[in-house]
C-alpha cells in the first residue's frame, strides 16, 4: 500500500519509522510519503493561510497550495483524497477495514480554522476522529493511518493478531495475562493454563461479550448474538 500525507508538519510523521509500521516500510509492504504543502505555495513569503472573508477569528488555509499539492501527488498516486475534518464520517474499525483494501490513499491534514471551501472539489472523502477539537489534522491522521496500515496483508505476522483485537469483530477484547501465573495473590484463570484450546476460545468469547456489554453497551446493542454466543454465555454463567 502507498500512502501520501499532505501536511504542514511532515516531521510529525517520523513516528511511522518505528515499530510494526516501520518494519513494514523496510520490507516494502508499505510506503508512506509526506508532502509539505508549504512547498507548493506561490506566495513569496511562503504563506499558506490568510484571513477569512466575512471576518471571524483565526486563519484559513488557502486553496492554491492545497490544490497544487494534490495535483502533483495525483500524478503518481491515484488513490482517494481523504481530508481530516470535523464534518466528516466518524472513523471506526469498519472504515479502517474498508480503506485497508485500497492500494493507494492520499491524506490531507488541515490546520488553523479550516481550508478554503474551493479545495473540497479535489477531496473524495472527509473523515473525523470524533466529536472533539484537535490542533490540526495531523493529530487525527496518525492514528487513522496506523489503524489502516496494520490491517494490510503482511504487516502483522498473522490475521489472528488483529482479528482478536477490540472492535475488529464489533466487540471489546478479552483480558490478557502473562507470567508469572500468580502476582500479588492474584492468579491467572485456570482455563488459560489448561492447554484446552476450545475451552480457552469459549472463555475468551464469553469475557469479550461480558466486557462489551458492561463497558460499551452501545456496541453490544449493535452486535448480533449467535446461538453459539448465547450458549457460551449460559455455560460461562453456570460456572460462576
UniProtKB/Swiss-Prot annotation:
Q: Which Pfam families match?
A: tRNA_m1G_MT (PF01746)
EC number(s) recorded for this UniProt protein? 2.1.1.228
- Enumerate the residues binding S-adenosyl-L-methionine: 110, 129-134
- Kind of enzyme, top EC level? transferase
Q: Name one GO biological process term.
A: tRNA N1-guanine methylation
A GO MF annotation of the entry reads: tRNA (guanine(37)-N1)-methyltransferase activity
Q: Where in the cell is it found?
A: Cytoplasm
| GO cellular component terms listed in the entry, alphabetical order | cytosol
Q: Which family does it belong to?
A: Belongs to the RNA methyltransferase TrmD family.
What HAMAP family would the database entry show? TrmD
Q: What does this protein do?
A: Specifically methylates guanosine-37 in various tRNAs.
- What this protein is called in its record is tRNA (guanine-N(1)-)-methyltransferase
Q: Which organism is it from?
A: Clostridium botulinum (strain Okra / Type B1)
Amino acid at each position: 500500500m502507498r500512502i501520501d500525507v499532505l501536511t504542514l508538519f511532515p516531521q510529525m510523521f517520523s513516528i511511522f519509522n518505528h515499530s510494526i509500521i516501520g518494519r513494514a516500510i523496510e520490507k516494502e509492504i508499505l510506503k508512506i510519503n509526506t508532502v509539505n504543502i508549504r512547498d507548493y505555495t506561490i506566495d513569496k513569503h511562503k504563506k499558506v493561510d490568510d484571513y477569512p472573508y466575512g471576518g471571524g477569528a483565526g486563519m484559513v488555509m488557502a486553496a492554491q497550495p492545497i490544490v497544487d499539492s494534490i495535483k502533483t501527488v495525483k500524478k503518481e498516486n491515484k488513490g482517494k483524497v481523504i481530508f481530516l475534518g470535523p464534518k466528516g464520517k466518524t472513523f471506526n474499525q469498519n472504515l479502517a477495514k474498508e480503506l485497508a483494501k485500497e492500494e493507494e490513499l492520499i491524506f490531507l491534514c488541515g490546520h488553523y480554522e479550516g481550508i478554503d471551501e474551493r479545495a473540497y472539489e479535489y477531496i473524495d472523502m472527509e473523515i473525523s476522529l470524533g466529536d472533539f477539537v484537535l490542533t490540526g489534522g495531523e493529530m487525527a491522521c496518525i492514528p487513522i493511518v496506523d489503524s489502516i496500515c496494520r490491517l494490510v496483508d503482511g504487516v502483522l505476522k498473522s490475521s489472528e493478531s488483529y482479528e482478536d483485537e477490540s472492535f475488529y469483530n464489533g466487540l471489546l477484547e478479552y483480558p490478557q495475562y502473562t507470567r508469572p501465573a500468580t502476582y500479588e495473590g492474584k492468579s491467572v484463570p485456570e482455563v488459560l493454563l489448561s492447554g484446552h484450546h476450545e475451552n480457552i476460545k469459549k472463555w475468551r468469547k464469553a469475557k469479550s461479550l461480558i466486557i462489551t456489554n458492561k463497558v460499551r453497551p452501545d456496541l453490544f446493542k449493535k452486535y448480533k448474538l449467535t446461538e453459539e454466543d448465547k450458549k457460551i454465555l449460559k455455560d460461562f454463567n453456570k460456572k460462576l
